Amino acid sequence: MDNKKATLELGTKPVGKLLAQYALPAIIAMTAASLYNIIDRVFIGQVVGPMAISGLAITFPFMNLAAAFGAAVGVGASTTISVKLGQKDYESAENILGNTITLNLIVGLAFGGICLLFLDPILRFFGASDATLPYARDFMQVILAGNVFSHMYFGMNAVLRAASKPRMAMFATIFTIGMNILLDVVFILWWHWGIKGAAFATIISQVLALCWQMKLFTNKSELLHLKQGIYKLKSNLVRNIISIGISPFLMNACACVIVIFINNQLVRFGGDMAVGAYGIANSIAMIFVMFVIGLNQGMQPIAGYNYGAQQYDRMMRVVKLSIITAVCIMLTGWSLAMFAPYHCARMFTTDPELIKGSIKAIHIIMMMFPLIGSQMVITNFFQCIGKVKISIFLSLSRQLLFLLPLLAILPNFYGINGVWASMPTSDFIAVVVAVTIMLVFLRRFKKER
């Protein structure tokens, strides 16, 4: 299909079919991404041991922080490209592509280099003990050395979705997971590289996928393609990218702060095994969170295009449909957590103590899952239409304004259970706030129209 025709369909095709067309590939891609992280942890937990799982959990803040910088560029660029395509401003969209590549190179190299210089002190601050530090260090040395490739890979995937190529983005992710699993088998099972093997598998698979992505954008027949003159940073484009990307940046940066605090509270009230239990519970929860993130990625170009084209009824239909779908997804996750937590934990470890702690963590952490999907879609909606302040507030409220104080207070009264209970409590408050803000916004929006 002609690229311009595919883009125009964002404003004409039935919303349900359009959301399925864009969201399903993104959901598959994001679920695949979460699965290959889980597979890494399964290999590490079953082959290396429970302390390696705890060491890997210590590295979560690094992943959140890297994702924060990646989202600031990738999400900001993809949203801006979608709006420009809706406005038929193809030249600006192409320049954003080039600026995205330059920004990812700068951010990826700077982040990886700085973190490598201060790796051990940072890991100690993140909650690493003498037992878990060697595992966390071995993993992050490799991940940070290849960080620039990760930034480029995720950034280009975001641009592919914005450029009406959701299936290509899905293929890139599925290719990455397949290669990652294959390399896990070689590096961990056959060559016995341990936790470093998992890190090498991750980076190498992303490098190979990035090469394929870049090849796609060298095709001059594409609506967006690489050419001279688009890589030089332009202040107005960078401002647009960062102003929209600041919301997901803050959300991921806050997640980094929260995970650091969680890890330290877990070590204080439950020891290294509690950190491992959180790593397992978080892995299960992230499967369903990534489902909704994939749904949001599919919604983003549709909502962004129709907002830019002033087709507001279509924009709202896709938002409502996304909320209903997100609730159904998270309800499925809740059912799994309530009725099959043992089987979830057993995938990662055979250690009875770690399994017991993981079951409790899974039960409590995922308690409010049926509600939290709506909050995620609402936050993404405000980001899609450029309501940066509202999106930032909703991003901050769930993690920083609600969860952080609860983590500081509840464990002093309820010990390790207080750490677990802080998470669903903050989820519930965040949902109430997000729904209230959305209803107020819709009333005002209808009056202005």
Task: Name the predicted role of every residue range.
Residues I53-G113, S150-A169, A277-P341, I372-S391:
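Small-residue-rich hydrophobic transmembrane alpha-helices
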Residues Q21-D40, V142, T176, S205-A209, ...:
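Transmembrane helical elements of multi-pass membrane transporters/channels
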Residues G74, V142-R161, A169-N180, A198-C211, ...:
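Short runs within selected transmembrane alpha-helices of multi-pass transporters and secretion channels
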Residues L65-A68, N180-D184, L210-M214, M286-M290, ...:
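Hydrophobic transmembrane alpha-helices of multi-pass small-molecule transporters
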Residues M1-A23, I81-G146, W190-G245, A303-M368, ...:
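Short alpha-helical transmembrane segments in multi-pass integral membrane proteins
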Residues A20, Y36, D40, V73, ...:
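Residue-level signal for transmembrane alpha-helical positions in Major Facilitator Superfamily
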Residues L35-S54, L123-D130, V186-W193, C256-S283, ...:
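Helix-terminus/linker motif at the lipid-water interface of multi-pass membrane proteins
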Residues T12, G16-L35, I39, F62-F69, ...:
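Residue-level signal for short hydrophobic patches within transmembrane helices
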